[in-house]
Amino acid sequence: MIRVASPAKINLFLHITGRRNDGYHELQSIFQLIDLYDWMTFTPRTEAEDNLSITGIEQVDLEQNLIFRAAQLLKLYAKKYCGLNIQIEKQIPMGAGLGGGSSNAATTLLVLNQLWDCGLNLDQLAALGVKLGADVPIFIYGKNAWAEGIGEKLTFVDLDQKQYIILKPDCFISTQLLFSQKTLTRDSNRTTFCAYQLKPSDFGNNFEALARSLYPEVEEAMQYLDQFGQAKLTGTGACVFTEVTPEMNVSEIVQHAPCKSYVVHSLNKSPLSHFMTDI
């Protein structure tokens, strides 16, 4: 049995810089890993039981589950294949812009790469991961990164240690709906990591205005956090966050928050790093 932590992320900013011929959007962003985790337990089955089961999450269609799809992709490379039960203890809210599903898929690839003796390196695992989602590779490499392309072109960066307050509004945001809006900014000027470092407060999220206008719960959460610092949207939402500063009374802010809240710390590397260095 192997039990591991599968971390979340926030986007410190997110700009859409263009649209490709295949319909995918080009973006620039910074992925920051945080210490909010799902816990995943991998338990091998007996030789007679070669199937895969997943418990702990509600999933009507297993074929659409990212954990199952990650395992199916890696199964082709297995030298010591065995059936598995994968149990997940969810702490990362789903559909919130925190990358929980992508992180779970990456964790599955990393753990099963060793358990099944697949022998793939990180670049090979990331190439599989991007088939599941553009932000899966960040969790494969387990480092904070400046992201470009559709999110898969990564330049690893050193970021200062921070603490954040995250609010999870009680709504589910449709990414498809946001992308379909004509008012979505799709031509932000390309920028650099150095420019971000000089004035991070100038860098926002192109989805924020739409999320605030279409979802009153997001507007309420952002107005609340804006009283104490600069509120930002992560991903396409619904979660919003602000950086903790010395003058903040964190416990009071959390106590009076209009929705579920989390206090998290930034990570410099994933807790799965031992699965990465051993490959």
Curated annotation (Swiss-Prot):
Gene3D superfamilies: 3.30.230.10, GHMP kinase, C-terminal domain. Pathway: Isoprenoid biosynthesis; isopentenyl diphosphate biosynthesis via DXP pathway; isopentenyl diphosphate from 1-deoxy-D-xylulose 5-phosphate: step 3/6. GO terms for molecular function: 4-(cytidine 5'-diphospho)-2-C-methyl-D-erythritol kinase activity; ATP binding. One of its GO terms (biological process) is terpenoid biosynthetic process. It is an enzyme of class 2 (transferase). ATP binds at P93, M94, G95, A96, G97, L98, G99, G100, G101, S102, S103. It catalyses: 4-CDP-2-C-methyl-D-erythritol + ATP = 4-CDP-2-C-methyl-D-erythritol 2-phosphate + ADP + H(+). InterPro entries: GHMP_kinase_C_dom, GHMP_kinase_C_sf, GHMP_kinase_N_dom, IspE, Ribosomal_Su5_D2-typ_SF, Ribsml_uS5_D2-typ_fold_subgr. The active site is at K9, D135. Belongs to the GHMP kinase family. IspE subfamily. PANTHER family: 4-DIPHOSPHOCYTIDYL-2-C-METHYL-D-ERYTHRITOL KINASE, CHLOROPLASTIC. This is 4-diphosphocytidyl-2-C-methyl-D-erythritol kinase. It comes from Acinetobacter baylyi (strain ATCC 33305 / BD413 / ADP1). The lineage of its organism: Bacteria, Pseudomonadati, Pseudomonadota, Gammaproteobacteria, Moraxellales.
